[in-house]
Amino acid sequence: MGCSPSKEGNGSFSSTSTSFIHGSESHPEYDMLLKILVIGDSGVGKSCMLLRFADNRFTDSYISTIGVDFCIRTIELDGKKIKLQIWDTAGQERFKTITTSYYRGAHGLIIVYDITSMDSFNSIKRWLIDVDRFASPSVLKLIVGNKCDLNSKRAVDFKIAKKFADELNIPIMETSAKESTAIDEAFIKLASDIKKSTPQK
């Protein structure tokens, strides 16, 4: 399940992969273009995270992402314009063939679980198997526990989640798309880590 996408602003969603905006040599729109893939079970709030990051919006109206959607946002890191193409993948098994094709070329991956759902946390292992199969060996990862505003319904203790992430040497943090908690920080952290790992021209 996902949030209904906004129709306004530069963060509008599209399922058409030809809608990218590329800078030219004479009028560059950005210094670096990064592709980030957001994966995880259906209903963990992936679309809501993108909507919050791209448009600073949240809606309680839910629709399932069909296939793959994306949003674009340009940020500044160390004086450089970084354009982020953030891909929101469907969590349902029936879209697996479609979504796994988008792993190729991804610079970073955010694996999302719902802190109120132990099943979604346990699914991280399955998602990481797909990452190992389809993504570049150099892809950087971030595990995110979303919906931390629902702490009273928490099913996944952060200490347990952090121990799991530490064993895999993957950073982890918790977010709330509804309350806009650490959403920007999550995407910016991953983008910063990718930038640091990329050879500078």
Curated annotation (Swiss-Prot):
Residues covalently joined to lipid (N-myristoyl glycine): 2
Positions of region (Disordered): 1-20
Gene: Rab1C
UniProt-listed Gene3D superfamilies: P-loop containing nucleotide triphosphate hydrolases
InterPro entries for this protein: P-loop_NTPase, Small_GTP-bd, Small_GTPase, Small_GTPase_Rab
Motif mapping: Effector region: 62-70
Post-translational modification: Although this sequence lacks the C-terminal cysteine motifs subject to isoprenylation in other Rab proteins, it does have N-terminal myristoylation and S-palmitoylation sequence motifs.
Source organism of this protein record: Dictyostelium discoideum
Family classification: Belongs to the small GTPase superfamily. Rab family.
Keyword match Isomerase: no
One GO biological process term: response to bacterium
Key words of the record: GTP-binding, Lipoprotein, Myristate, Nucleotide-binding, Palmitate
Pfam family, one: Ras
Lineage of the species this protein comes from: Eukaryota, Amoebozoa, Evosea, Eumycetozoa, Dictyostelia
Gene Ontology cellular component terms for the protein in this record: endosome; Golgi apparatus; lipid droplet
Lipidation (S-palmitoyl cysteine): 3
Chain positions recorded as GTP binding sites: 40-48, 58-65, 88-92, 146-149, 176-178
Any one GO MF annotation of this record: GTP binding
Source domain of life: Eukaryota
Protein name according to UniProt: Ras-related protein Rab-1C
